[in-house]
Every structure is written in C-alpha cells, then in structure tokens.
C-alpha cells in the first residue's frame, strides 16, 4: 500500500545483529520505495504457551524464521521442533486457538497479553543485546536538509556478470575515501547474467 499511497509509510526490518540481512532489497526494487530513516530497536523473544503448560511439555515451537534463528540456542537446549510461520503475533494467535499444550510460540509479551497465553520463558534470544535495524520507507522522494547533520545514502545499481565489473564500479569510492557500510547482491529477475547491488554509504 505504501507504494501506491504517499500518506502510508512502511516500517521494514532490514538486518539483525545476530542473523544478519533480513532481505528488503526486493521491496526497494519491485515497489520503487524510498528510504527515509533508520531505527535500531532491541528485540526480546519469549516462549509462549497455553495457560497451565510447562516447558518440559513443549515439543513444537512456531514463529517467524528470524525469531526462530535468533533463539536457536534455546530451541536446541529443549530439543524443540521448529515450525516457520509468517509472523510472531500470528504464531501466538495460532497457539491460542490450537489448544495443544505441546505447542508454543516465540513472540512478544504483548502477544501473550492479547492472546491470553502463558509466558513460559522470557528473553530466550541468543544475544542478550539482540538488535534489529528497521527502515522507514515510502513512495515519495524527500530531500534531506544536509546542513543539519550526517546522512546515510542507500542506492541500487546493476552490473553484468563479468570479471572486475564490481571492482570497476566501487573503486571510485575507495579512491575518494568513501566508506561502504553495506554491499549486498541479488540476481536480476529470471537471470543470473546480471546482478543488482544494494549499497549504503
């Protein structure tokens, strides 16, 4: 919707301190979204189950792929079967409706409150200081006031797959002392002969 309506903005998770890139490059390319701001939020994961359930009863855990990956140590410790769902809140809702005490969800404390679930264990993420970078994105192009501070610039470019193509494209940044904080590649649709690159400088 944010690609069609200027009044609607999207907040998208871009990368995580523990698991790395989450993957928003296709959104920027497919929907021609512009990045306005970045925000870093601490992420706390919690194991939720039905009221009265116990951790030693749990056999299956449901959540978003990122939440599962960021809680892998806990999952291995309790030998839980992972089940990937679209999002964490939806996983909590599924547990509340399923009525099976062997199933659990990794989600927020707010989800536990909304869906009347038991918090079986708080802060199960691998990294105590787990942080995710979010991007505020939208349709319109906004020109920042460059005299009011430092800014990060994100941009896309495309190269054919041939020797030294990437080196030639990026050497100018090195020669001029420009620091690249992100460089990510993904293939052009239906082709591996050319690639798009997403950069932050």
Predicted regions and their residues:
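Domain-level signature for soluble enzymes in the chorismate/prephenate branch of the shikimate pathway
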Residues: 1-201
């Amino acid at each position: 919707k944010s690609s069609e309506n200027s009044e609607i903005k999207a907040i998208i998770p871009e990368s995580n301190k523990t698991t790395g890139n989450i993957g928003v490059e296709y959104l920027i390319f497919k929907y021609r979204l512009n990045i306005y701001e970045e925000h870093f939020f601490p992420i706390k994961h919690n194991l939720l189950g039905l009221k009265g359930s116990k951790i030693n009863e749990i056999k299956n855990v449901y959540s978003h792929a990122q939440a599962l990956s960021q809680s892998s140590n806990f999952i291995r410790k309790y030998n839980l079967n992972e089940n990937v769902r679209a999002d964490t809140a939806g996983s909590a809702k599924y547990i509340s409706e399923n009525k099976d005490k062997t199933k659990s969800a990794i989600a927020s404390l707010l989800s536990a409150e909304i869906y009347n679930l038991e918090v079986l264990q708080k802060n199960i993420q691998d990294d105590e200081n787990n942080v995710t970078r979010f991007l505020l994105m939208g349709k319109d192009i906004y020109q920042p006031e460059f005299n009011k501070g430092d800014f990060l610039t994100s941009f896309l470019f495309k190269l054919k797959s041939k020797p030294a193509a990437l080196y030639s494209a990026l050497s100018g940044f090195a020669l001029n002392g420009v620091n690249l904080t992100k460089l990510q590649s993904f293939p052009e649709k239906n082709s591996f002969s050319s690639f798009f690159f997403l950069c932050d400088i």
